[in-house]
Amino acid sequence: MPALCLFFALGLNIGSWASRLADLKIAMSITDMELGFFLLATSLGAISAFPLTIWLLRHVGARKMALLLGSVTACLLPLIMNNTSHHLGLVLMFIEGICCAGLNAAINTYGSDIERKHDIKCMSRLHAVFSLGLAAAALISMGLIRFVSSELIVHGAVICVSLLTLFAVAYRTSEQCRTSDSDDKQPEPKLINKTTLVLGIIVLSATIIEGSMNDWSAIYLKDVIDVSPSLAPSGVLVFSAAMFIGRLFADSLRSQYNDAILIAFAGLIVSLSLATGVWLSGLYASWVSFAIVGLTVSLVSPIIYASAAAIGPGCLSLISTFGSIGGLAGPPTIGFIATHFGLTSGMYFVAASGVVIGIAALKLAKHQHTPQYASL
């Protein structure tokens, strides 16, 4: 129960401001390039978070760290939503990046510890709950705009209360399945080697796709496909719902097929489906391509996190940071591309990230029988 709350809360937090980026852009009166810098601040925060993440995991423990950083993100959200200054927005998103990166590492460490202690495979399902949080954020956004108020501060306040409630539930129930802090303080092995670099490239590319689809699909539908503002968040909804469904079945697929081959096929399907959807254009083509991308890319991150956990907690912490950087660096990259070449070109860049996943996964498939790739 606590782990489910934490994964859901992270998805709800990120999905809430991501689904309102089009409105935040208007509120701050900024261009696509400035929106790119706004999102870049989160990736810089994620990069800066790595030393703090390692220190907190060693000295505080994953459970307490998740609750602490999660509460900070909840309180940040109304400030982000009510902000009209681009410069203040950069500061707020930098802090958001630090907290989200640390929270991501903490909950994945917590999840892998549950797998180890109870001898179960649940990482994909936990990531499915994260995707459910993203989908819930999009649904809440659409519902608030349509039936309550389109004001960003109202949205921020509702999500803030919801997040704090989730963290309170996680705190009250965590005693029943908590991991010991001593487990979180294991000595960290050497982190940089061929294994972590290949795993890092894959999860970086996968989270670039995830983050870009979460942050730009609504803007793509509104600015390129020209849908109504109330329908724009449907892009996030379709993508995140598909990711949720894909991750529900990821563990069973892993028991039948080779992990590296699954990742390679996922990367290629992502590239082909998204490129085709962008080329065809139109709302329905976009929905179908977003759904296929969500179903296939959903397999990648849980497999990589599980493999990193099998190598050791240090590797898992590093890979979690790679994942946060990818998820937060992808969207501003799309913003810069959109400014100079158009948002359609930015979506093609997202599709190209799938090719990177496929190539890196083939390298894993070649070396899966060597000791350092034994978990794959």
Residue positions per predicted region:
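Short amphipathic helix-loop junctions that connect adjacent transmembrane helices
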Residues: 19-33, 215-231
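Helix-to-loop junctions at the C-terminal end of transmembrane segments
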Residues: 49-62, 145, 246-258, 338
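Conserved MFS/SLC helix-loop-helix module at the cytosolic interface between two early adjacent transmembrane helices
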Residues: 49-87
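Structural signature of the two symmetry-related core transmembrane helices
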Residues: 64-78, 261-276
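Helix-loop junctions at membrane interfaces in 12-TM secondary transporters
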Residues: 81-92, 279-289
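Cytoplasmic helix-loop-helix junction between adjacent transmembrane helices
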Residues: 94-128
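Symmetry-related core transmembrane helices of the 12-TM Major Facilitator Superfamily/SLC fold
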Residues: 153-170, 347-363
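A late C-terminal transmembrane helix in Major Facilitator Superfamily
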Residues: 313-343, 350
